[in-house]
Amino acid sequence: MTYAESTRSAVVYSSIVPPPRTPVGPPMLKDGVRKGSASQPLQPKNGANSLDYWSKSEDEKSGITCYYSRHNIQFPPPQRKMKPVKPNPVGRSTINGFTPSTSSPQNGLRYPPFPQNTPESVMSPPVGIYRNIPAMPRAKLTKDEKNGGKMNRDGGGENPKNVVWGGTSRKDDDTASTPLNSFSANASIEKKRSTARRKPRWARCFQTLFCCVTPPREIEKIQSSQRTNSTNNNHQNGRPSTPTNTGPPIQLITQVHRDGTVTGLPTTGQACQQNGSGDGVTPYDKIANDSVGTINEKPLLPPLLPQDSNKKCLVIDLDETLVHSSFKPVKNPDFVIPVEIDGVEHQVYVLKRPYVDEFLAKVGEHFECILFTASLAKYADPVADLLDKKRVFRGRLFREACVFHKGNYVKDLSRLGRNLNQTLIIDNSPASYAFHPENAVPVTTWFDDPSDTELLDILPSLEHLNGFSSIYDLYRPEEGPQSELLNHCSC
């Protein structure tokens, strides 16, 4: 037996299969209440439970008798989930052989099912009777109810995108679906689970619109050049620029490793910018192309002191010649130098080469000693302070004084302001004295060998060279310097 529920139920439910049970009529009720249930009168107490309050309807085909009330008695809708049913074949009556009435409720009257307090196992599900709703399966929600529209009460119109008619989805068969019921909590939970958010397409539209005018790669180049120009302007105006991470801390020190590789060397473009040239020409290339008499470059060293006027100039390297430094902790370091790089403080562990103190004390008596290193001053200057306690070095030159030539830092002795025939260089890297190999006293690279005696072994050679008026007198004429540039003195 079928009863009408309410106006809202008529929109939600469309068809139902009647349960097999005996119809309940007025003779089976006592005072408007089903036998065996709680006392809840459905009609005024002063009125009798007569057929005047009920209307009777019979179906000849199915043999079902229906009783319905016309009184303004309102009951809350049943909180019961309904299972979807299969659609009725075309050509048959839409609701159990009855054609639903097209009349709308008057004076706000609602027609609830009867009886209300009947157990759920006995009650018939409500159906709508106010409109001619065609029989169809119930709609199911798939993913997101926001993308779809509401059901058309008349059954017409285009189906929403997220509503699936029937048992499975058209887009994704594996997507879980729930019945479209405005009174069930599953629909609200499904709304909360919706996480699909559409991104705005304005950026794509602008990119598509202006792609021919300025491609994305060109935009990145322009932004990069603007950042570089702003950084250069800050340096020129004396304002601190934003610190940038130029690489690992190992670039602070120029070192020769055990495998022969050299770290701390910049790229060719960076070296040209450091040397003030953007065309790839180094200062040495300019010196080599110019005549000797037209060079007016300022010397790197100050004039000779009176006590050093009769001494030869001895240029000494620092890393792997006198000391070995590492950013990794070592056992029993001689010095630990704190160095700040990009706002972060790093610890540099320094080991002194064996007999370095005796070596510096000996050469300081006979030579004008100059410290020349390809490392940065923020690291090399504190190391020199701890290493040279007797102030043997008359001057200190760092990476800024080197010339970057063919991928290496070269120490150009012609820029010192000393006579080349009175200048010697001690270095473990042949690339450092590539411009003046005849002035070099090579030494082996030292890392951590405690039995090394290289510094003591070269002392006799230095004393022997100091006895000549010119270091080139040691060579035969065919082995001497072949270029006027090597004999040039800029003092």
Curated annotation (Swiss-Prot):
Its cofactor is Mg(2+). Optimum pH is 5. Phosphatase which may play a role in the egg laying muscles. Residues 37-49, 176-187, 238-249, 264-276 have a biased composition (Polar residues). Residues 223-237 have a biased composition (Low complexity). The record marks T373, K411 as: Transition state stabilizer. The gene is scpl-1. It is found in: Cytoplasm, Myofibril, Sarcomere, M line. Residues 141-156 have a biased composition (Basic and acidic residues). Disulfide bonds: none annotated. The lineage of its organism: Eukaryota, Metazoa, Ecdysozoa, Nematoda, Chromadorea. This is CTD small phosphatase-like protein 1. Disruption phenotype: Both RNAi-mediated knockdown of isoform a and of isoform b decreases egg laying triggered by serotonin treatment. Causes no visible defects in unc-89 and cpna-1 localization in body wall muscles. One of its GO terms (cellular component) is M band. May interact (via phosphatase domain) with cpna-1. Isoform a and isoform b may interact with lim-9 (via LIM zinc-binding domain). Isoform a and isoform b may interact (via FCP1 homology domain) with unc-89 (via fibronectin type-III domain 1, Ig-like C2-type domain 48/49 and protein kinase domain 1 or Ig-like C2-type domain 50, fibronectin type-III domain 2 and protein kinase domain 2); the interaction may act as a molecular bridge to bring two unc-89 molecules together or to stabilize a loop between the 2 protein kinase domains. One of its GO terms (molecular function) is kinase binding. Keywords: Cytoplasm, Hydrolase, Magnesium, Metal-binding, Protein phosphatase. Residues 307-465 form the FCP1 homology domain. It comes from the Eukaryota.
